UniProtKB/Swiss-Prot annotation:
GO terms for cellular component: acrosomal vesicle; sperm flagellum. The keyword Cell division does not apply. Residues 47-63 have a biased composition (Low complexity). Residues 1-124 are annotated as: Disordered. Its main location: cytoplasm. Residues 81-102 have a biased composition (Basic and acidic residues). This is Ciliary microtubule inner protein 4. The keyword Lipid metabolism does not apply. Keywords: Cell projection, Cilium, Cytoplasmic vesicle, Flagellum. It comes from Mus musculus.
Length: 266
């Protein structure tokens, strides 16, 4: 079998033309090829009518079909009758019907996107200017009663406009006198008002440490070893206490017997 490929045509030549099976294959192949050629011709005609066909020329792009919307699916189910399927409607006619329905659905979606005012869609939380934490804290009903979305947008717009005004920005060409006059009211408040201490007017303060803890008080004080404030009662404290007593005893013994040994040596 020899195949010669051309644009839109395909020719087949068999070496055994008298074979009946070969003739049947040829007839079935021609019938299928003619139906494919008709569908391709229709698709080329649609592309030539569209603005993309003029720019692409003879070549064409196979665009994947758009997924039908729920309304289109219902319309397709309504319009498809079992009688048409029983009669054996051609595939090309069903494809044409589907394409027309898809075009209509796409047109409806485009109209919906172009005219959002006609659709009454409730305002979502994402589009709201008021943060969700405020609505959660005070309740959405209370927030809606106190402030509306328009008022919130207006307040935010005024704030941004005030920031964008050049008059509100501190100019770099201001003299130090002008700069000091701007903050004069702030510095007139005083240190206590500016630091939020509010301790009142300054007063003469006198420490009572020397008046209460005089040398007489320290001399008359009696230290109770058993009930000494800050005394450690754990094993480490006991060991240090015993060690201090041993060191003091050793020093006393050295002083006592050291003097006796020195006197004997003399």
């Amino acid at each position: 079998m020899e195949l010669s490929h051309r644009q839109g045509t395909t020719t087949l030549t068999r070496t055994h033309p008298n074979d009946k099976e070969g003739q049947q294959d040829m007839n079935s192949f021609r019938a299928n090829h003619s139906s494919l050629d008709n569908s391709k011709f229709k698709y080329h005609a649609r592309l030539s009518q569209s603005p993309l066909g003029s720019s692409l020329g003879q070549g064409y792009l196979e665009t994947p079909p758009l997924p039908p919307t729920p309304t289109c699916r219902t319309s397709l189910a309504m319009n498809s009758h079992p009688e048409d399927l029983k009669k054996g409607a051609s595939r090309s006619s069903s494809r044409d019907a589907r394409e027309t329905f898809r075009e209509g659905c796409v047109g409806e979606e485009g109209q919906d996107s172009r005219s959002p005012e006609q659709r009454t869609v409730p305002l979502s939380k994402k589009d709201s200017v008021i943060p969700e934490n405020i609505r959660h804290k005070f309740g959405s009903k209370m927030v809606d009663q106190l402030i509306s979305e328009d008022q919130a947008r207006q307040a935010i717009g005024e704030m941004f406009e005030g920031q964008k005004r050049p008059s509100s920005w501190p100019s770099r060409t201001q003299s130090p006198m002008q700069a000091s006059s701007i903050f004069s009211d702030y510095y007139d408040l005083g240190y206590h008002m500016r630091s939020n201490l509010f301790q009142g007017p300054p007063q003469e303060t006198k420490s009572l440490m020397k008046a209460s803890y005089t040398p007489e008080v320290i001399e008359k004080s009696v230290r109770d070893v058993e009930h000494w404030h800050g005394r450690k009662t754990d094993d480490l404290g006991r060991w240090h206490r015993k060690n201090a007593m041993n060191m003091n005893l050793q020093k006393a013994l050295e002083e006592k017997y050291g003097e006796k040994s020195r006197s004997k040596a003399k």
